UniProtKB/Swiss-Prot annotation:
This is Uncharacterized lipoprotein SAR0439. InterPro entries: Csa, Csa_sf. GO terms for cellular component: plasma membrane. The lineage of its organism: Bacteria, Bacillati, Bacillota, Bacilli, Bacillales. It comes from the Bacteria. A lipid is attached at C23 (N-palmitoyl cysteine). It is found in: Cell membrane. A lipid is attached at C23 (S-diacylglycerol cysteine). It comes from Staphylococcus aureus (strain MRSA252). The keyword Membrane applies. It is a lipid-anchor. Residues 1-22 form the signal peptide. Its main location: membrane. Belongs to the staphylococcal tandem lipoprotein family. Keywords: Cell membrane, Lipoprotein, Membrane, Palmitate, Signal.
Length: 257
């Protein structure tokens, strides 16, 4: 199970590297259940979904605080990955991260293919540089594998087809809080009839019929800040020592450092 812990740490580091940010405009959270507050904290971002044309983000502003320099329009980062335990002792993780700079109206990132190992062996990782123009992913590195090349060029982020505006229908979640970080987690059982679940099943090799769990994680202030992150995961895993999930985040942070 060690490689699953390493994978979780790797994802957290990836998120901190590419999106140390709070998502969406800050919203005054009224006193109420933490479940409600967490959903409200996510709502401003998730209400933007689906973002069919990612270039629309050039004209959208997220939560701003004192970390932004005067005149900095900020940068959106969108990230989606699919992780699956295909072989005993191994975990395959594949996805894309894209940074959209609102100052220059340019979008650059990379597609990644990573394999984690339980025996302590260092992960195998390959990154392929990409950019986006006219809402189309353009591969900058040479890829000889035609299947992989097509997968990269036709890649769609979960946020481009997801519809999570009806968060209110998910209730009685399992909430956990660490006030020292602070961090907040809530989990909801999803139905296989959910359109988001159907979309994921049509796009990824999800072998189980098990209904997934929607996991919402926040590091940082619930009201929003440019320090911390928000992560959404739809987990299809059948067993504790296996992994089958899709992770998504959309964040807004200063573009100028």
């Amino acid at each position: 199970m060690g490689y699953l812990k390493r994978f979780a740490l790797y994802i957290s580091v990836m998120i901190l590297m590419f999106a140390i940010a709070g998502c969406g405009k800050g919203n005054e959270t009224k006193e109420g259940s933490k479940e409600t507050q967490i959903k409200k904290s996510f709502a401003k971002t998730l209400d933007m979904y689906p973002i069919k044309n990612l270039e629309d983000l050039y004209d959208k502003e997220g939560y701003r605080d004192g970390e932004f320099e005067k005149g900095d329009k900020g940068m959106w980062t969108i990230y989606t990955d699919f992780a699956k335990s295909n072989k005993p002792g191994e975990l395959d993780d594949e996805g894309m991260v894209l940074n959209l700079d609102r100052n220059t109206r340019t979008a650059k990132g990379h597609y990644f293919v990573t394999t984690f190992y339980r025996n302590g062996k260092l992960p195998d990782e390959k990154n392929y540089k990409i950019e986006m123009k006219n809402n189309k992913i353009i591969l900058l590195d040479e890829v000889k594998d035609d299947k992989l090349k097509q997968k990269i060029e036709n890649f769609k982020f979960f946020g481009q087809y997801a519809n999570l505006k009806e968060l209110k229908k998910y209730n009685n979640g399992d909430v956990s809080i660490n006030e020292n970080v602070p961090s907040y987690d809530v989990e909801f059982k999803m139905s296989n009839k959910d359109e988001n679940v159907k979309q994921l099943r049509s796009r990824y090799n999800i072998s189980t019929e098990k209904s997934p769990i929607l996991k919402m994680h926040i590091d940082g202030d619930l009201k929003g800040s440019s320090v911390g992150y928000r992560k959404l995961e739809i987990d299809f895993s059948k067993r504790e020592n296996s992994k089958l999930s899709v992770i998504e985040f959309l964040s807004y942070k200063p573009a100028k450092k």
